[in-house]
Structure formats: structure tokens, C-alpha cells
Amino acid sequence: MTALFPFDNSYARLPSHFFGRVAPTAVEAPRLIRLNRALAVDLGLDPDRLESPEGVEVLAGQRVPEGAEPLAAAYAGHQFGQFVPQLGDGRAILLGEVVGRDGRRDIQLKGSGPTPFSRRGDGRAALGPVLREYLVSEAMHALGIPTTRALAAVTTGEQVIRETALPGAVLTRVASSHIRVGSFQFFAARGDVEGLRALADHAIARHDPEAARADNPYRALLDGVIRRQAALVARWLTVGFIHGVMNTDNMSIAGETIDYGPCAFLDTYDPATAFSSIDRHGRYAYGNQPRIALWNLTRLAEALLPLLSEDETQAVGEAEAALTGFAGQFEAAYHGGLNRKLGLATTRDGDPALAGDLLKTMAENEADFTLTFRRLGEAVPGPDGEPDPAAVEAVRSLFIDPTAYDRWAEGWRRRLKDEAGDAAARRQMMRAANPAFILRNHRVEEMITAAVERQDFAPFETLLTVLARPYEDQPDFARYAEPPEGGGRGYRTFCGT
């Protein structure tokens, strides 16, 4: 019989101080909550075997599968601006890597027991955070945003102690890699240039193979990470996503969204929104995310200085030149995304101001971010040059002062006259850019309460069904598109560790 996971491991071949070898800790009574069968097929795995007793034991950490080389990776990181020289995987164990139809992917268990980096923690995960990450990562994937994926969620039959006793669970996470900005900081902080070089060479081979042919491969690696992060954060903003804990150890060089602990989506639009209970000063607020991304990338550039050039002045020049490119790349991606949300297929000098004026009006009028843009797509002028009055009223109703929307919409409709194409095509473009469904924060809490307190996973399954098709109307699930009463003000998220 073939192996359950056809592992082809590369990170485990790196020097031993890159990680600590550790096996998952067995649990009492593993039970499968959900297997992502479609993802399993994409990875070249047999979903039926993964759902078998043997498969569930592997997904729970009860059994180490053939070919696995379980390890916990070492890394450092800036956490809320403060540098911590050693963090590492404290509750996650990399089983190995598989090569599927989309390339090489890590298979990692989260909540599978203590590791050398657990720092007195139990290495376990509670059910609520596991279900949250499963849902959010799959919702982000359906939205078309680069992200880690969830292969499976398993309950352990054990309790974990946080503020109270909670049911334990294990998440199987899939990622292009788990190399973080903090991975490079770990070696740079120790003055380990050879370790830094080995990690960079591994990253180039895995994520930027064309960089190996560049005049300066390490500068090309840095350029690639910057380009991916600029595009990623722009995509976050266009769907109202707030990561919540953008520490350097939570930034993947693969350009995937990773570590979903205290994340959330905007309800009412306010760029100062920060949901995380530990982000007391709004460092990682919605509108700060581009600035923080650049700050994190600057820390990566600092770590790479010894590789960029043997001459310190030249190395700094290379780093600064690379970082200078972030702003333009982010702005192009962000404003391109906003244009699509407004139904604009071409670019004009005044477009950023047009979008900015709408966002300002939304903030002043406490309009819902997702519903405003979705309904705007139905309010485009028809063949006769006039919008549907009912569609216009549906947008206006989201604003405290509907006439503020009216004033903005006059300029928008004038701008649309510069565009080719008919109203139907424009409406279709806007529907593809403006989701009807995001993972509403109050629905997350309802789902977690049902699962944790009543062992009822029906709300979890329903949300998975709805969020798999975020750009479709789905009339039977219309209530899941609605914001909470009060626009979500006062909502708080917790990292779950």
C-alpha cells in the first residue's frame, strides 16, 4: 500500500539548528470534525484513507505517518515592535512536504503537543480557534486571496486549560512554506551568516527559483517577497480583512496569509478599526496594515544585509532600493482593486480621489463596507443612462445621511461615462470584485458557541457552504450577508493561545 502522505521533505535536510525534531503527542479519543476532501485531492492524497481510523489518528497526531520527519521550526520575531530573539513553533509540528498539482506544500499539525519552543505552554489548541482558522483560511481562499489552507480539523477528546477548560482540537494546515520574516531574523540576530545563507538559498529554490539566475540572487529574493506582500496586503484591504497580529513571525515570505488568531473582517467601515484584544494602541488596525507590512519588510531587509553585499554601504543601498519599490507596488495593486470594485476597467488620474471620497463618506456615515460595494454594483446606470431606483435606494439606506452618498455618486456616474462596455458587463465585473458574503464576526461567535458548548457543528458546516461561493447571491443564505446590529462596534477577538 502506498504511503498516506507521499512525503518529499526539504526543510528537514537543512542544518539541525534550524529546528527541533519532535513527534506529536498522542491524544485520548481523536474524532474527525471535517476533512477538506477537495484540497486532499489537489495534494495528491486519498481522502477516503484520510477519513479512515488510520488517517484520523495521523491528523490528530496519534500516529506518525510513513515518511514524515516531524519538526518544530526555529524563528525569532518582532512582536508589537519588540524583538524576541527566539520564538519558534510552540504548538505546531511540521510533518513534512508533499508535491501536489499546485507544487510543494507543507503539512503541519497545529495543537499537536509541546515542542522545544513551547516556553512552558502545553502545545495544544482549543476547538474554537481551530474552527475559526479553518473557516477563515478557506473563506480567504474562496475570495481569491493567497492563504494557508485547512486540510482537516479533529477533536482530541481532551480538555485544554485556558481561562476555563475547553475542548481540545488539532488543525492540519497546508502552506506553500512556513518560512517567515522571523526565520531570517533568527539567524541574523545570532550573527550566523552561513545559517542565513542556507535559509535564503532554500527560500530561493522553493519560492523564487528565477532569482538564482539574477546578478544578486539575495536582492532578487528580497524583491520577490516585497512584491508578494504588497499585492497581498492590497487584497486584504479590498475585502475589509484585518489580520490583527502582523508580527514579523506572522509574515510568510511566500506571500500567503498565515496565522489567523485574532483576525476579523470589517463590518462598519472605519480605517482605525482594530479588533484584537491585545492590540490596545491600534498598531495593526485596518488602515495601518500597509505601513506595518513595509516595517516588517524593512526588518527582513536588515536581516539580509550580510548577503546583499560584503560592503556594508552597498548592502544598505541594495536594501533601500528594494524597499523603495513597495509603495508603488502596493498603490498599484490597491487602487487597481478599488477601480474594479467601482466598475472601472481603465485608469484615470482622478480615480484614487474618487475611491477615497467614497471611503471617507462611508466612514462618516458608518456604512457597512461589504454591503456598500456589493449593492453599488446593482446601482450602475442601465442602457438608458439611469440606474435602477430600487438599487440606488438599497445603497443609500446604508448611509446615515443618504444625500452624502448622492453627492459622491454624481461624480462616479460621470466617471463611468468614460468607460466602454455595457451595464451588464460592468455589473458582472463588480460582482466578481465585491463579495456578497464575508465571514461576519457575529456568525463566527455563534458557530464557536454551538460547537464548544453543544457539540453542534451544523453552523460550522453551513458557514463553510456559504463562504465557498462568496461572489454569488445565494438567496437561501441571505441572512449571512447581513451585518450585526450596531455595525459590529465593540467586537473583540482573541488569539486563542
Curated annotation (Swiss-Prot):
Record field: catalytic activity: L-seryl-[protein] + ATP = 3-O-(5'-adenylyl)-L-seryl-[protein] + diphosphate; L-threonyl-[protein] + ATP = 3-O-(5'-adenylyl)-L-threonyl-[protein] + diphosphate; L-tyrosyl-[protein] + ATP = O-(5'-adenylyl)-L-tyrosyl-[protein] + diphosphate; L-histidyl-[protein] + UTP = N(tele)-(5'-uridylyl)-L-histidyl-[protein] + diphosphate
Pfam families with a match to the protein in the record: SelO (PF02696)
Cofactor: Mg(2+); Mn(2+)
Active site per UniProt: 249
Protein name according to UniProt: Protein nucleotidyltransferase YdiU
Binding site for ATP: 88, 90-91, 110, 122-123, 173, 180, 259
Family indicated by similarity: Belongs to the SELO family.
Keywords recorded for this protein, A-Z: ATP-binding, Magnesium, Manganese, Metal-binding, Nucleotide-binding, Nucleotidyltransferase, Transferase
Native source organism of the sequence: Methylorubrum extorquens (strain PA1) (Methylobacterium extorquens)
Function summary: Nucleotidyltransferase involved in the post-translational modification of proteins. It can catalyze the addition of adenosine monophosphate (AMP) or uridine monophosphate (UMP) to a protein, resulting in modifications known as AMPylation and UMPylation.
